[in-house]
Amino acid sequence: MINGVVLFPGAGTNANHQSLIAIESAIKNTNTKINVVRVDFEYRKAGRSFPDKTPVLIETVRNAVLQAAASWKCATNEVVIGGRSMGGRMCSMAIADPEQKLEVAGLVCVCYPLHPPKQPEKLRSEHLPRVTAPTLFINGTRDEFGTVEELTAATSPMNNKKHVWLDGARHDLKNRDIEVGELIASWVVSL
């Protein structure tokens, strides 16, 4: 049973980004008792625009998930985590950490940033084969951070994954937030 969902924003936004609000709203509209919390990274709370180093971001994910699970009186394996772009990537890295693996019920990656735009040689996927939680990837077919072919290839070693491709959408998924929220809510309820 899923007790809650913890959501993290992309690098250039915060927890009040419209996409995270749409996900929260869609989950609440399922009429389940699934809790949702949107979490800001520490650099945003401090008013900085440039992200902290990866280990700091991963630790923020881990601490937020542990805190949410404690407040909901459940184990972390009853919690789905994820986020948009960098937020989803940091969640995937927390799950894949071989020394402090975070056991969760599922992972949602909206606009997974497989590589920087126009730099396909700089893949951010080495850890993905270690992600064992059920994973939902939602990406646009025109996402400049990774093509359909690139992301499909990078995630091929993962056993329990699902891809949803939004035709014509770029990394911003412009005007698709409600659709994305509904897709995620449906997937979370199905776990």
Protein language model annotation of sequence segments:
Residues 34-37, 157-172:
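Catalytic histidine neighborhood in serine/cysteine hydrolases
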Residues 61-133:
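Primarily recognizes the serine-hydrolase "nucleophile elbow" in alpha/beta-hydrolase
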Residues 20, 124, 133, 147-154:
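Short alpha-helix in the alpha/beta-hydrolase fold that links the catalytic acid
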